[in-house]
């Protein structure tokens, strides 16, 4: 993900790995992986693509977290929008 700084407009790149590292550096008790938040009304093709991307990001985040667990927990967000089958699959992954 690329953001722009509110201070000077500089581009800031945030990967699943750098997101976890930043939360660890801040001493977060609970780390949340990056995910894509979609609007409520979205077509199935876009929903499935977002679902797959988010789960790839979660795996990368978990790998980074497990390299240096410390006393921090990681929680994943359940995805799938209003598609109950995708939400169930998200819980099982």
Regions found by a protein language model. Name each.
Residues 1-69:
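Non-catalytic, usually N-terminal nucleic-acid engagement modules in DNA/RNA processing proteins
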